[in-house]
Regions:
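Catalytic pocket of metal/acid-base enzymes, prominently hydrolases
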Residues: 1-29, 125-129, 134-147
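Short N-terminal helix-initiation segments at or just after the protein's N-terminus
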Residues: 4-10, 39, 270-274
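Active-site core of metal-dependent hydrolases
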Residues: 8-123
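Glycine-rich, acidic/polar active-site loops that bind/position phosphate-bearing ligands
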Residues: 124-312, 317-402
Length: 402
């Protein structure tokens, strides 16, 4: 690719605000933004115009299908592809995409995990457009597909995914934080957002060697074996010089992520041999979560192109560090105030101290729920032992705040 690749490719496969402003009539764009900012119901007429613009943009980029892209309780994403084709009376089929098709989908929910909250005879499930997370184009062997981020629920409204609880929690935090800000006299604050920047640690191994290990293939980790002759005893792999083969992978990975508007910022060797890390710039929590799912999917695809396998299991090898998603979480007002920023005089910053105390109280009273959210077989293999963090919930404030 030519020089200045970042500027050339960044966001090219995303139906972002800049594209919407260019594709939509001014009055429709203003109405859309108002709906988004105020959290109001989307007018059907506006939805039809947005859907048409989205379809035309996707067709310009070679798309033939669209999908409601959602995150069931499987740990990975799900999608069902529908083409833009609609039957015409006598002539050739026409290409259509309506506001109704944009807003709501109807995948079968019968075979997705539900935790027992969905009645077995109610097989129908619904996807609902998360209009706060931009649509994007996915390029693969199937061609180009327009992916619309959505929430997923049952026929009777129970959440069957991981996004719906996240959106609800973001709304709950916004509602209470706005209430507190008004008590401090910040009447101009209308919304408070959570921001997250989750890093992604991973291992890269030669694909030929990977295919010789059935335990890695079927479980994502080694179940038996001998320790490596050289592990991480010298800490010389951490931040070490990146090898050419890995650097080539990272270059391709960055370009794929930038196309999707993912702010891939930092890359380096991690502690364990063959372990590496990619860290993005933070963004709104639900968008950041969508991005992390895409990061993991793209890492695996790009690794195969380079004759490698990307291992995302939290503890693929015994005796060396595992992989995590350390992140920086914060809450920010729509006027740009970081509510967890202590400032130069934190002991005098009443607003900061109040929100900090609220976070401490929430962690203290809901430690079990927080621990449960990170409890799965892979993570439980990783937590504790010689690694940080331990398998308990704790808060470290630093000497000044303590």
């Amino acid at each position: 690719m030519e020089n200045n690749v970042l500027e050339q490719v960044y966001g090219k496969n995303v139906f972002n605000d800049e594209v919407m402003q260019a594709k939509l009539p001014k009055d429709v764009y203003k109405s859309w933004k108002k709906t988004l900012e105020n959290g109001e119901d989307l007018d059907v007429d506006i939805a039809n115009v947005v859907a048409h613009a989205m379809k035309e943009w996707a067709l310009e980029h070679g798309a033939t299908h669209y999908t409601h892209w959602f995150q069931p309780m499987t740990g990975v994403t799900a999608e069902k592809h529908d083409s833009f084709l609609s039957p015409a009376s006598k002539s050739r089929p026409v290409l259509e995409f309506s506001g109704k098709e944009l807003i709501k989908g109807e995948p079968d929910a019968s075979s997705f995990p539900s935790g027992g909250i969905r009645a077995t005879f109610e097989a129908r499930g619904y996807t609902a457009w998360d209009c706060t997370s931009p649509a994007f184009l996915k390029e693969d062997a199937a061609g180009v597909t327009l992916c619309i981020p959505t929430a997923f629920c049952s026929y009777t409204g129970e959440a069957l995914d991981k996004k719906t609880p996240l959106l609800r929690s973001m709304e709950a935090i916004s509602k209470q934080a706005v209430r507190i800000m008004k008590l401090f006299g910040y009447d101009d604050v209308k919304k408070v957002s959570c921001s997250v920047g989750p890093e992604q640690e991973y291992f890269l191994v030669d694909r030929e060697k990977y295919l010789q290990r059935k335990d890695l293939i079927f479980s994502g980790r080694t179940l038996f074996g001998a320790p490596a002759p050289k592990g991480q005893e010298l800490d010389d792999h951490y931040f070490g010089t990146i090898k050419e083969r890995i650097a080539s992978f990272m270059k391709d990975l960055n370009e794929e992520l930038w196309k999707l508007g993912i702010l891939a910022k930092t890359q380096h060797n991690e502690v364990a041999p063959a372990q590496h890390e990619m860290a993005p710039i933070f963004t709104t929590a639900n968008i950041s979560t969508d991005h992390n799912q895409l990061v993991m999917e793209i890492m695996k695809k790009v690794a195969k192109r380079h004759g490698m396998e990307c291992l995302l299991h939290e503890k693929p090898f015994a005796g060396v560090n595992g992989s995590g998603k350390h992140n920086n979480w914060s809450i920010v007002t729509d006027t740009g105030i970081n509510l967890l920023d202590p400032g130069k005089k934190p002991h005098e910053n009443t607003k900061f101290l109040l929100f900090l105390a609220a976070v401490i109280k929430a962690v203290d009273e809901n430690a079990e729920l927080l621990r449960l959210s990170a409890s799965n077989p892979g993570n439980d293999h990783r937590l504790g032992a010689n690694e940080a963090p331990p398998a308990i919930i704790s808060i470290f404030l630093g000497e000044q705040l303590e």
